[in-house]
Amino acid sequence: MLDLKRIRNNSNEIKEALNNRGEKFDVTVIDEVLKLDEERRNILVKVEVLKSKRNQVSSEVPKLKKEGKDVSNIVAEMKNLSEEIKGFDATLAKIDEKIQYIMLRIPNIPNPQVPDGETDEDNIEIRNWLEPTKFDFEPKAHWDIGTNLNILDFERAGKVTGSRFTFYKGLGARLERAVISYFLDTHTEKHGYTEILPPYMVNRTSMIGTGQLPKFEEDAFKISEDDYFLIPTAEVPVTNLYRDEILKGDELPLKHVAYSACFRSEAGSAGRDTRGLVRQHQFNKVELVKFTKPEQSYEELEKLTNDAETVLKELGIPYRVVRICKGDLGFTAALKYDLEVWMPSYNRYVEISSCSNFEDFQARRANIRYKEDAKAKPQYVHTLNGSGVAIGRTVAAILENYQSEDGSVTIPEVLRPYMGGREVIK
């Protein structure tokens, strides 16, 4: 959520920034929120005048009573003033509700570093690692490799549940578990993150806090009876861990890593990478989340991105890092990098992680603040997160980049200790 004071003082700048985003945003709502804000402030002035008058009148009552004078007129005036204040308070509550409704639907403002552009084709490659994998045979797609090795079963998952679900079997299940354990061990032991195992269901307030709601409710799996949501990413519960709290400045940055299953309806994604493991309704992911002081956040974003890159380097999977343009930035991020792995069957790079700085956008929605010391005024933290990284897509990238002509798959060296020393799946 944006700072209303920032909108008030820089409305034209805000409108221009919002106009440059991918989804054309109706900037007239900025004028609407400013009009409501002005109305609210005018009413507050009136309320303060009325309260001052009521206090002045009420202070006269004891003295007049002591003198034996009739105070019925003054009491009646006090009652009228209180009723008038009550009416204004009700109006203010309605105005606040309208302002909140609009503010929750205004996207974040892109950082000046974000490049211009309208689609993902305008994203800028920052760096890459390893050349795309070459084969002297026609490489197979990971869904064919997994099916032929009897380690992935899409057909039976379709029977049991529906499309875009998977059974991992035998060494496929073990490979998935190995990747999860390797990622968690790397981020906790080498990168200094504290591990969190979060709930897989959250309430509506949590989804609003991280920006999934109200805009993306159609993409969420909802348990209507309790108004709970299955998490689309561990970012939601881990960020909301500190909702409505004031952190200590010397604790920052806080660094958490969380493994979780993730659940997404992927509404509107029909036909986009829907085969295999790339776009599933349920998938596993290791998430990195940071809470920082504002002046630290962009340095910490670079570190977070490098932490995510480390596991791809150690796995030996070719990848690149792209800086996301304004048109492809999404609702909540101020600046975002995507890590994309090379997928031979696609003959292109596929996103495996998004690393974002939200600045104070989520912190304002979730009311997460910090104080430098006991006497200092609370300030909003900056929140960051990134996949560290998506598990299913990692398994897919391993199957495709490490495949052999005979259909077997070499296990990356760093995963072999988690696979009982096994070197090949065949």
UniProtKB/Swiss-Prot annotation:
This protein's pathway: Aminoacyl-tRNA biosynthesis; selenocysteinyl-tRNA(Sec) biosynthesis; L-seryl-tRNA(Sec) from L-serine and tRNA(Sec): step 1/1
Domain remarks: Consists of two distinct domains, a catalytic core and a N-terminal extension that is involved in tRNA binding.
Ligand binding (L-serine): T233, A234, E235, E287, S387
Compartments reported by the entry: Cytoplasm
GO cellular component: cytoplasm
Entry EC number(s): 6.1.1.11
Protein name in the entry: Serine--tRNA ligase
InterPro entries linked to this entry: aa-tRNA-synt_IIb, aa-tRNA-synth_II, aa-tRNA-synth_II/BPL/LPL, Ser-tRNA-ligase_type_1, Ser-tRNA-synth_1_N, SerRS_1_N_sf, SerRS_core, tRNA-bd_arm
Biological processes, Gene Ontology terms: selenocysteine biosynthetic process; seryl-tRNA aminoacylation
Source organism: Clostridium botulinum (strain Okra / Type B1)
GO molecular function: ATP binding; catalytic activity, acting on a protein; serine-tRNA ligase activity; transferase activity
Quaternary context: Homodimer. The tRNA molecule binds across the dimer.
Keyword vocabulary terms for this entry: Aminoacyl-tRNA synthetase, ATP-binding, Cytoplasm, Ligase, Nucleotide-binding, Protein biosynthesis
Function: Catalyzes the attachment of serine to tRNA(Ser). Is also able to aminoacylate tRNA(Sec) with serine, to form the misacylated tRNA L-seryl-tRNA(Sec), which will be further converted into selenocysteinyl-tRNA(Sec).
Reaction catalyzed: tRNA(Ser) + L-serine + ATP = L-seryl-tRNA(Ser) + AMP + diphosphate + H(+); tRNA(Sec) + L-serine + ATP = L-seryl-tRNA(Sec) + AMP + diphosphate + H(+)
Keyword Iron carried by entry: no
One Pfam short name: tRNA-synt_2b
UniProt superkingdom: Bacteria
Keyword Cytoplasm: yes
